[in-house]
């Protein structure tokens, strides 16, 4: 699912509340219709074995990445979560 910047940040916040790890974020451009991913706007954060205590930090970094991408003109995002 492609997400608006606001929705992507909301997904990160909800993931933190539910204890879900954000594995990656891919930024791109919404073309109406369609989505063009930009491989230079891809963020990943390796999940350590003892990841539960690091979920807040992981999700904070994910949100910071989205905000940086917004400043660089990206308008849509795909988020990959670890259930």
UniProtKB/Swiss-Prot annotation:
Coiled coil: none annotated. Gene3D superfamilies: 3.30.190.30. This is Colicin-E5 immunity protein. The gene is imm. It comes from Escherichia coli. Keywords: Bacteriocin immunity, Plasmid. One of its GO terms (biological process) is bacteriocin immunity. Pfam families: ImmE5. This protein is able to protect a cell, which harbors the plasmid ColE5 encoding colicin E5, against colicin E5. The keyword RNA-binding does not apply. InterPro entries: Colicin-E5_imm, ImmE5_sf. Signal peptide: none annotated.
